Curated annotation (Swiss-Prot):
UniProt entry keywords in alphabetical sequence: Host cytoplasm, Host nucleus, Host-virus interaction, Inhibition of host innate immune response by virus, Inhibition of host interferon signaling pathway by virus, Inhibition of host RIG-I by virus, Inhibition of host RLR pathway by virus, Interferon antiviral system evasion, RNA-binding, Viral immunoevasion
Highest taxon of the lineage: Viruses
Gene this protein is translated from: NS
Location relative to the cell: Host cytoplasm; Host nucleus
The species this protein was found in: Influenza C virus (strain C/Yamagata/1964)
Family to which the UniProt record says this protein belongs: Belongs to the influenza C viruses NS1 family.
Molecular function (Gene Ontology), one example: RNA binding
GO cellular component: host cell cytoplasm; host cell nucleus
GO biological process, one term: symbiont-mediated suppression of host type I interferon-mediated signaling pathway
HAMAP family: INFV_NS1 (MF_04066)
Its biological purpose: Prevents the establishment of the cellular antiviral state initiated by host RIGI, which normally triggers the antiviral transduction signal that leads to the activation of type I IFN genes by transcription factors IRF3 and IRF7. Also participates in the up-regulation of the splicing of viral mRNAs.
Record protein name field: Non-structural protein 1
Length: 246
């Protein structure tokens, strides 16, 4: 077994525990799926005890570290909610009152903005990879990425979304429409794979258009306000996209 297997188990232990802490937000089907994930993760932990002995509590603690920090509560957002128009309908974008976790607090993600050859850091391009349609942003390495996992009782599936937050401008630079996936554990593993793939995010044509619309309205300050980024003061807020009315 590899170290990746151990890390994966620890991540699943942390996520399952955190989701069950919000049991009141889970419908019966989702709660059963998370409980099943917790049970299977504990079984993996026992299997790994021969080469990586640790307690369930240790696995949760390490999983939290791998997830990059304590879960933060999004409070009193300082940025104005926006909306974008698609096919005659307005999609409101609000700051969700749910928990978020900052991702990617390492030097490459905290470096200054790097424009592409045209001097445009907001460009997004689409391409296909292994059957999935992906959006890849052209280099702005100061983006603060976040991931949000929340149950959707109406569809009994897991929704997840990504937000790009520019530390230079203190503004949201882009986001992805929450995607629906069948199965809690499958969905969370997809989230982890997206995180590991850098600034490549699973999306579709509508998501790309909205992403470009948000980015086109953003302003870029190409210089740092401080010589050294202050990670502790970096704030990340999650956007949720409500379904448009009929």
């Amino acid at each position: 077994m590899s170290d990746k297997t151990v890390k994966s188990t620890n991540l699943m232990a942390f996520v399952a525990t955190k989701m069950l802490e919000r049991q009141e937000d889970l419908d019966t089907c989702t709660e059963m799926q998370v409980e099943k994930m917790k049970t299977s993760t504990k079984a993996r932990l026992r299997t790994e005890s021969s080469f990586a002995p640790r307690t369930w509590e240790d696995a949760i603690k390490d999983g939290e570290l791998l997830f990059n920090g304590t879960i933060l509560q999004a409070e009193s957002p300082t940025m104005t909610p926006a909306s974008v128009e698609m096919k005659g309908k307005k999609f409101p974008i609000d700051f969700a009152p749910s928990n978020i976790a900052p991702i990617g607090q390492n030097p490459i993600y905290l470096s200054p903005c790097i424009p592409n050859f045209d001097g445009n850091v907001w460009e997004a391009t689409m391409y296909h990879h292994r059957g999935a349609t992906l959006t890849k942003t052209m280099n702005c390495n100061c983006f603060q990425r976040t991931i949000w996992c929340h149950p959707n009782p109406s569809r009994m599936r897991l929704s997840y979304a990504f937000v790009l937050y520019c530390r230079n401008t203190k503004k949201i630079c882009g986001y992805l429409i929450a995607k629906q996936v069948a199965g809690i554990e499958t969905g969370i593993r997809k989230c982890f794979r997206c995180i590991k793939s850098g600034f490549v995010m699973a999306t579709d044509e509508i998501s790309l258009t909205i992403l470009q619309s948000i980015k086109s309205g953003a302003q870029l300050d190409p210089y740092w306000g401080n010589e050294t980024p202050d990670i502790d003061k970096t704030e990340a807020y999650m956007l949720s996209l409500r379904e448009a009315g009929p």
